C-alpha cells in the first residue's frame, strides 16, 4: 500500500495495539457501541473513522479522506463535520434511521499536557425514537418509540409507547391484529423488542441475532433489538418503580396489563441507556384498553386519508387539513391524535362535544381564546428539555412569553361550563412568580451559544457584575493609561494597541525610541516602530483575560443552576401544556363548525346511522363554493323489518361519486366520535366500534400479491373482525377475476355481512346482478348515483337515490377519458350486440356461448 493510499479496514478487524493513542481511545468506545455511528469530537469537528466514515461520506455526501493511524495501519478512512453544523447532519442521518453516538471532549484541550490524550466520553446516543431536540423533530407530529414483548404461551403482546419529547407514556396488551392497528395509528420512528438468536448457519461461528417480532412488523418498521433479560418481569417492574418513585405499580393497572408493563420497563431502560446522564422526566404512565376506542386498521386509515393523502402523502387534502385551525404545535399534535383514535364511550364523546358546542355559541370567547393561543410556544416539548438539562436560554424566554399569556387565558375561560383549566387555577400564582423569576434572571435576547456569555441580567450576581465592570471599564482604563504614558514619556504619538498574538502593547515610532523609560520591555520590532509592555499594562491584560474567562464560566454556572432549579416546575408546565392543547383543539373544532356550517350530531348507543344532506369534509373545502352535492344516508344495523336499510347496494357509473359518498359517511362517523360537529344538516350516529374500508388496492409486489389477492386478504380480515356495531364500506368486491367468480364472491360477501354480521354496510358495485338480492333479504336495499343522459352524453348529478342502476355507462366514461373514436365506436357496436344476445339467452335459458365474431356471451347470475 502506498504512503498516501487509504486502508479501507473495518474497526472490528483492527488490533488496538497497532494504533495511535487517540485511535486506541476511539476504538475502545466504538467497541462498546457496535452498529452505531460514532461521532468523535476532535476540536471543532466531529470525526468518524473506518466503516463509519465510509457510511457518513455516502449518506451525507462528504469527502472521504484519511488519517494516519500508526505505522501498521497507515491512513484509515476519515469523514468529519463541523460541530456548529452537527444538527443539520444529525437530522439527515436520523431520517435515514441511523443511530449516532456523541462522544464529546470532557476537558478543555488547552489544559491537557503535551503527549496526553484529551479525556472523552459518550454524552448522548441519538436514535430515531429518542430525540428531544426541537430542530430534529417535526413540530406538528409526535415522535413515538414503542416496545413490544410477546407472551410465549399465547397470542398476546405487551405494548408500550412514549414520545419522550412531550412526556406521553402509555401501555397496554392485545393480540397481534390490534397491535398492528396501533402501530398504524402511531407510526413509530422506532420499535424496541427482545433479540432472538437464529440457528447457526454452515461456516458460521456465532449465531446472528434478529428482533423477536413477526415479519409484518419488522418489514415495515425500524426495529432495534435489546437483550431479552431487559423485558423480564422483575427487571422491568423495578425500572418503573425507580422512575415513578413507588413501591407498587398496582395503581397504574399493573395486574391487568403485566405484559404491557414489561414492555414499558424495557422501554425505559432503553431510553435510560441512550440518554446517559440526561434522562428526561416522566410524570406518569397510563394503561389503556384498545376496546375503549374506535378501531381503524392501516388500510382504512390510508383509504380515508385521515392525516395525509394516499398518493402524495401530503397533509393538504386530508381530513386533518380540513379541520386543523389549531394555533399551537401542541394542539396540532393532539388534534392528529384525536382523529387517529376516535372515542367509543358516549359520555366521553359528549364531554368534548358539549365544549365544542359552547364555544360555537360563545363566539367572543372562541375568538379571544384563538387569538391568545396564537402567542404560545411549544411549552410541552420545552418542558422535556428542561427536565433533561438541554433547555437553552432562548427556551426560557419562549417559556416566559408563553406563561405570561396564561392569566389572560384563565380569565377568558372562567365562565365556560367546562373549565379546561380548573386544576391549573390552583397554582396560577405560583406560575406567575416563576415567570417573574425568569424575567429577573435571563436577558430578553440571549445568545444562541451557551458559553458565549451575555445570558444573565445585571444584579443577579454581585461577583458577575464585578467581572463585567472590569471588562466594560477596560476601554476607559486604556485611554487613561495612554494619556498618562504620553505625559510621563513626552512621546505625543505613543499608542496603546492590542492583537490576539501579542496582547496589549505600547507602540513607539523609531524617531522617539531615545525617549522610552527603563521600565518598558520590548515585545515586537516593526519596520518603523517598536512595541513594548510594562508591568502595569501586563497586569491589566491578565485581569481582563481572567475576568472574561471567569465571567463566562460564572454565567454558565448561574444558568445551569437556574435550569436545575426549574426542573421542579416541569410537571406543572406539562399540565398547563396539556390543557392548552385541549383548549386549542376544541377551539379549532368549534371554528370549523362555524365556518363550514356543520351540525351538532346526536350520539347514542343505538344502531342508527342517519345523516341529512351530508357532505365530504375535505372536498367541500376544495371545490368551488356550493358545487359539492349533499346526500342523505339512512342505515341501521341488525335490522329485523323490511322498512329499514342495513345493507346498501350502491350502483352507478365510474366517476359518479360512489367512493366519495362512502368516504364522506365514514368521515362523518369519525368526526362525530372525536367530539366534533359534522358536515350535514342533521345527523344521528349510533356509536361505531370499527370502520372498515375496501375501496381500492395496489399490487403488493414485495409480497408477490396481486390486486385481487390483496383485495381478498383485506375482505377476509373485515369478515373475521367486524361486529354489528361496525361500519363497513366495500367498493368493487370481486373485480380482477372472471365475471362468474367475481359476481359469486360479491354475492356471498354481501350475504354474509347482511345475515351473519348484521353490520351497517355500503356496498358499491358494478355487478347489477346483485340488485335482485333485495327480493330475498329485506334488510338489503338498492341505491344508485343519478346521471343525466342526452344524445349519448352523460352528466354526473352526484345524487344518491333509491333503486338500482341498470347500466354502468362505461363506454361514455371511456369517451370522456379521451379514448380514440374508433375504439369507442367499436365498443358501442359490441355492447349493442351483447345486449341483444343476453336478452335471447335469458329468454331461452341458454348458457354462455361464443358468436361468429369470437365475442363471449355471458350468462347472468340467476335467482
What are these regions (language model features)?
Residues 20-23, 39, 50, 80-90, ...:
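Amphipathic alpha-helical transducer elements in NTP-driven molecular machines
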Residues 34, 50-53, 257, 327-328, ...:
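ATPase nucleotide-binding head domains, primarily ABC-like/P-loop NTPase cores
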Residues 45-46, 50-66, 158, 168-170, ...:
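A conserved P-loop NTPase coupling/switch region
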Residues 233-238, 295, 310, 401-476, ...:
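Amphipathic heptad-repeat alpha-helical coiled-coil/stalk segments that mediate oligomerization
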Residues 370-373, 397-400, 573-582, 586-590:
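Hydrophobic alpha-helical segments characteristic of transmembrane helices
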Amino acid at each position: 500500500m502506498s504512503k498516501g493510499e487509504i486502508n479501507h479496514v473495518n474497526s472490528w478487524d483492527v488490533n488496538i495495539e497497532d494504533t495511535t493513542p487517540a485511535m486506541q481511545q476511539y476504538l475502545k468506545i466504538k467497541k462498546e457501541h457496535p452498529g452505531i455511528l460514532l461521532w468523535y469530537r476532535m476540536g471543532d469537528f466531529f470525526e468518524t473513522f473506518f466503516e463509519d466514515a465510509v457510511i457518513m461520506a455516502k449518506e451525507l455526501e462528504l469527502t472521504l479522506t484519511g488519517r494516519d493511524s500508526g505505522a501498521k495501519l497507515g491512513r484509515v478512512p476519515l469523514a468529519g463535520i463541523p460541530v456548529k453544523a452537527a444538527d443539520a447532519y444529525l437530522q439527515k442521518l436520523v431520517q435515514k434511521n441511523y443511530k449516532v453516538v456523541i462522544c464529546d471532549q470532557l476537558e478543555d484541550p488547552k489544559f491537557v499536557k503535551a503527549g496526553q490524550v484529551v479525556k472523552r466520553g459518550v454524552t448522548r446516543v441519538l436514535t430515531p425514537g429518542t430525540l428531544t431536540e426541537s430542530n430534529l423533530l417535526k413540530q406538528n407530529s409526535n415522535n413515538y418509540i414503542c416496545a413490544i414483548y410477546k407472551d410465549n404461551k399465547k397470542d398476546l403482546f405487551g405494548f408500550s409507547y412514549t414520545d419522550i419529547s412531550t412526556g406521553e407514556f402509555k401501555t397496554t396488551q392485545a393480540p397481534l391484529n390490534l397491535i398492528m392497528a396501533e402501530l398504524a395509528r402511531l407510526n413509530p420512528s422506532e420499535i424496541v423488542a427482545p433479540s432472538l438468536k437464529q440457528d447457526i448457519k454452515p461456516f458460521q461461528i456465532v449465531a446472528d441475532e434478529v428482533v423477536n417480532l413477526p415479519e409484518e412488523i419488522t418489514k415495515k418498521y425500524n426495529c432495534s433489538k435489546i437483550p431479552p433479560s431487559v423485558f423480564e418481569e422483575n427487571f422491568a417492574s423495578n425500572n418503573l418503580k425507580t422512575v415513578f418513585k413507588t413501591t407498587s405499580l398496582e395503581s397504574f393497572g399493573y395486574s391487568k396489563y403485566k405484559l404491557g408493563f414489561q414492555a414499558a420497563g424495557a422501554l425505559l431502560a432503553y431510553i435510560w441507556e441512550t440518554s446517559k446522564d440526561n434522562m428526561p422526566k416522566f410524570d406518569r404512565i397510563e394503561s389503556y384498553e384498545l376496546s375503549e376506542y374506535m378501531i381503524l386498521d392501516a388500510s382504512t386509515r390510508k383509504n380515508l386519508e385521515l392525516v395525509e393523502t394516499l398518493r402524495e402523502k401530503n397533509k393538504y387534502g386530508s381530513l386533518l387539513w380540513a379541520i386543523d385551525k389549531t394555533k399551537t404545535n401542541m394542539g396540532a399534535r393532539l388534534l392528529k391524535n384525536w382523529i387517529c383514535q376516535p372515542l367509543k364511550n358516549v359520555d366521553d364523546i359528549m364531554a368534548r362535544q358539549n365544549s365544542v358546542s359552547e364555544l360555537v355559541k360563545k363566539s367572543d370567547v372562541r375568538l379571544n381564546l384563538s387569538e391568545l393561543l396564537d402567542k404560545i410556544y411549544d411549552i410541552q416539548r420545552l418542558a422535556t428539555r428542561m427536565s433533561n438539562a438541554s433547555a437553552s436560554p432562548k427556551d426560557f424566554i419562549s417559556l416566559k412569553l408563553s406563561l405570561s399569556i396564561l392569566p389572560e387565558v384563565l380569565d377568558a375561560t372562567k365562565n365556560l361550563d367546562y373549565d379546561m383549566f380548573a386544576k391549573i387555577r390552583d397554582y396560577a400564582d405560583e406560575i406567575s412568580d416563576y415567570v417573574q423569576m425568569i424575567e429577573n434572571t435571563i436577558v430578553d435576547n440571549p445568545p444562541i451559544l451557551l458559553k458565549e456569555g451575555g445570558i444573565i441580567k445585571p444584579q443577579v450576581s454581585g461577583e458577575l457584575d464585578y467581572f463585567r465592570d472590569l471588562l466594560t471599564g477596560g476601554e476607559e482604563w486604556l485611554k487613561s493609561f495612554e494619556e498618562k504614558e504620553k505625559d510621563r514619556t513626552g512621546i505625543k504619538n505613543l499608542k496603546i494597541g492590542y492583537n490576539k498574538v501579542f496582547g496589549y502593547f505600547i507602540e513607539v515610532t523609531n524617531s522617539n525610541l531615545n525617549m522610552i523609560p527603563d521600565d518598558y520591555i520590548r515585545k515586537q520590532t516593526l519596520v518603523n516602530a517598536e512595541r513594548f509592555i510594562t508591568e502595569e499594562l501586563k497586569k491589566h491584560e491578565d485581569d481582563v483575560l481572567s475576568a472574561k474567562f471567569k465571567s463566562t464560566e460564572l454565567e454558565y454556572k448561574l444558568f445551569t443552576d437556574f435550569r436545575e432549579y426549574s426542573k421542579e416546575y416541569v410537571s406543572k408546565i406539562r399540565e398547563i401544556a396539556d390543557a392548552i392543547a385541549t383548549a386549542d383543539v376544541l377551539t379549532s373544532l368549534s371554528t370549523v363548525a362555524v365556518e363550514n356550517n356543520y351540525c351538532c350530531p346526536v350520539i347514542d348507543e343505538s344502531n342508527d346511522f342517519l345523516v341529512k344532506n351530508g357532505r365530504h369534509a375535505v372536498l367541500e373545502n376544495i371545490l368551488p363554493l356550493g358545487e359539492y352535492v349533499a346526500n342523505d344516508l339512512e342505515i341501521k344495523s341488525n335490522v329485523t323489518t323490511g322498512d329499514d336499510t342495513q345493507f346498501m347496494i350502491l350502483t352507478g357509473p365510474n366517476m359518479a361519486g360512489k367512493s366519495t359518498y362512502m368516504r364522506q359517511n365514514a368521515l362523518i362517523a369519525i368526526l362525530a366520535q372525536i367530539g366534533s360537529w359534522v358536515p350535514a344538516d342533521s345527523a344521528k350516529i349510533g356509536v361505531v366500534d370499527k370502520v372498515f374500508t375496501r375501496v381500492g388496492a395496489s399490487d403488493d409486489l414485495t409480497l408477490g400479491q396481486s390486486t385481487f389477492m390483496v383485495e381478498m386478504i383485506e375482505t377476509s380480515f373485515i369478515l373475521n373482525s367486524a361486529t354489528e356495531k361496525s361500519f363497513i364500506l366495500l367498493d368493487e368486491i370481486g373485480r380482477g377475476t372472471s365475471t362468474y367468480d367475481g359476481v359469486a364472491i360479491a354475492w356471498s360477501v354481501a350475504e354474509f355481512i347482511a345475515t351473519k354480521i348484521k353490520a351497517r354496510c355500503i356496498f358499491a358495485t358494478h355487478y347489477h346482478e346483485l340488485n335482485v338480492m333485495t327480493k330475498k333479504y329485506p334488510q338489503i336495499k338498492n341505491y344508485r348515483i343519478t346521471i343525466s343522459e342526452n344524445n349519448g352524453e352523460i352528466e354526473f348529478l352526484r345524487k344518491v337515490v333509491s333503486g338500482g342502476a341498470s347500466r354502468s355507462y362505461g363506454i361514455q366514461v371511456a369517451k370522456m377519458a379521451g379514448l380514440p373514436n374508433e375504439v369507442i365506436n367499436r365498443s358501442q357496436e359490441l355492447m349493442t350486440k351483447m345486449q341483444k344476445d343476453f336478452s335471447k339467452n335469458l329468454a331461452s335459458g341458454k348458457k354462455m356461448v361464443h358468436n361468429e365474431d369470437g365475442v363471449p356471451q355471458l350468462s347472468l347470475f340467476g335467482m
